[in-house]
């Protein structure tokens, strides 16, 4: 679509107008709408006339299906009910739907939309304290415990992260690769080693839903309390994969130890 060739500011403006339209399905009008994240998805803060805040996420580039989004909603609602971890609540429309499917007029593209309750605080970001990382580690453990026996409905489905690229396109080894044969060969060795360990983990570990995107911009800190959000990348995996993602974003052995202990 030519829409996605437009300057980012124009895209945001158009999607903000679309957000106002979508909010009528939730019985919300005259809200203040501001873009807070624009990338894989467009996320808007919504403040109603009475001061209640929400986060509205429009999936603009995501390959997620309605079944994937339904799985995300089912899992987060399960965590809302059972978990000692603070997570945002999915918000239903007036028709009691948690997912809205609507055509964005300016792009002509059908987009899937979800809305969550607002989380107060600041992102932990890329300079977390050791205390914060200790809380993150505890929260990941609780999330895993609460998810180990959770079962999705028949209408919902998620990918399983047992392939090297986690269901994304292969630009390393396919015909689209720009690598030299020598580089490809070296990466193939790394690939084979990684898949050997991955296959072993999948053979010996419990597989359940994982968050799969634990980093400082998906973790909120407010008055000493941690919240976890952005469940858009969740899928079936092993617990070590959640930890590997979280550790990837850390810089020092002290940080690693704080997360893991």
Map each language-model feature to its residues.
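A cross-family kinase active-site recognition segment
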Residues: 124-184, 207
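Active-site activation/catalytic loop segments of kinase-like enzymes and analogous catalytic loops
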Residues: 240-261
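Short Pro/Gly-enriched beta-strand edge/turn motifs at strand-loop
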Residues: 23-30, 192-203
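Conserved NTP-binding catalytic cores of kinases and kinase-like/nucleotidyltransferase enzymes
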Residues: 1-95, 225
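ATP-binding pocket architecture of kinase catalytic cores
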Residues: 49-152
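Activation segment
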Residues: 61, 121, 226, 234-236, ...
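Active-site acidic catalytic loop and adjacent metal/ATP-binding pocket
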Residues: 39-48, 55, 90, 195-241
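Conserved protein kinase catalytic core
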Residues: 63, 123, 219, 236-238, ...
């Amino acid at each position: 679509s030519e829409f996605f060739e437009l300057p980012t500011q124009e895209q945001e403006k158009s999607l903000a107008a679309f957000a106002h339209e979508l909010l009528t399905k939730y019985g919300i009008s005259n809200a203040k709408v501001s873009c807070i994240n624009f990338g894989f998805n467009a996320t808007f803060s919504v403040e109603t006339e009475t001061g209640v805040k929400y986060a509205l996420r429009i999936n603009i580039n995501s390959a997620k299906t309605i079944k994937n989004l339904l799985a995300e909603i089912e899992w987060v609602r399960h965590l809302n009910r059972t978990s000692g971890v603070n997570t945002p609540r999915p918000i239903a429309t007036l028709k009691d739907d948690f997912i809205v499917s609507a055509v964005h007029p300016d792009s002509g593209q059908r987009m899937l939309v979800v809305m969550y309750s607002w989380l107060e605080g600041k992102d932990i970001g890329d300079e977390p304290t050791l205390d914060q990382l200790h809380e993150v580690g505890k929260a990941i453990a609780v999330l895993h415990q609460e998810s180990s026996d959770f079962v999705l409905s028949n209408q919902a489905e998620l990918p399983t992260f047992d392939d090297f690229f986690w269901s994304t396109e292969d630009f390393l080894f396919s015909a689209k690769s720009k690598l030299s044969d020598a580089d490809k060969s070296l990466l193939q060795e790394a690939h084979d080693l990684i898949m050997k360990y991955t296959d072993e983990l999948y053979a010996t570990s419990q597989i359940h839903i994982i968050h799969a995107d634990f980093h400082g911009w998906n973790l909120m800190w407010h008055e000493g309390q941690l919240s976890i959000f952005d469940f858009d990348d969740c899928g079936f995996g092993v617990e070590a994969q959640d930890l590997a993602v979280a550790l990837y974003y850390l810089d020092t052995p002290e940080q690693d130890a704080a997360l893991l202990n």
